[in-house]
């Protein structure tokens, strides 16, 4: 392999909105995520609320079309 042409890998901490932190090797500087395996309903075993809407799109759709779609 040629030297100096490959990007440098860094160990970064990925931060979730729930407060969990995960370490990954990547070329990026900083990553923030909305959901991780600690707070996602699927991984927590909550199968009743698999719709995760962080921006209100589901409620906006239901307000526009009702429950009879």
From Swiss-Prot:
Cofactor binding summary note: Binds 1 zinc ion per subunit.
Keyword Zinc: yes
Cofactor: Zn(2+)
Top-rank lineage group of the source organism: Bacteria
Entry keyword set: Metal-binding, Ribonucleoprotein, Ribosomal protein, RNA-binding, rRNA-binding, Zinc
A GO molecular-function descriptor: structural constituent of ribosome
Gene Ontology, cellular component aspect: ribonucleoprotein complex; ribosome
Residues the record lists as binding Zn(2+): 16, 18, 36, 39
One GO term of the biological process aspect: translation
One Pfam assignment: Ribosomal_L31
Function: Binds the 23S rRNA.
Family listed: Belongs to the bacterial ribosomal protein bL31 family. Type A subfamily.
Quaternary context: Part of the 50S ribosomal subunit.
The protein's name: Large ribosomal subunit protein bL31
Gene: rpmE
